[in-house]
A protein has these predicted regions:
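Conserved, structured core segments of small domains
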Residues: 1-115
Length: 115
């Protein structure tokens, strides 16, 4: 089986708006998320979680930045297409924020390093 990193994406404005959801809306979203997680339990390697503030580090140092990544999971599947099929248009992340999207990136195996 191959492993894939799943990135739950949206604009920073959409994430800020989602954070203002009512307790009832939040519970409804979490219930849908847990149902989806249970459905794909056998494929879930790491349930991941929400992500916070971002630091960008380059040759000049570290600075605050924003990006569209709100959370992650790691799944396993036979193929990239099979992994993508786990995250259809009815996925809770896509339902909670109409402008949201999900990116699925294959995690490549690390070559053995000979010393």
């Amino acid at each position: 089986m191959k492993k894939f990193m799943v990135l739950y994406m949206a604009s920073p404005a959409d994430f800020e708006k989602a954070m203002k959801a009512s307790p009832d809306q939040h519970k409804k979203g979490m219930d849908a998320w847990m149902k989806c997680t249970s459905k794909h339990k056998k494929s879930l390697v790491d349930g991941g979680g929400p992500l916070g503030k971002t630091k960008r580090v380059d040759a000049k140092g570290a600075s605050n930045t924003k990006n569209g990544v709100g959370g992650y999971s790691i799944v396993q599947a036979q193929s990239h297409d099979a992994a993508a099929k786990m995250f259809g248009k009815d996925h809770p992340h896509l339902q909670m924020m109409p402008g949201a999207w999900i990116e699925i990136v294959e995690i490549m195996p690390m070559p053995d390093i000979v010393t």
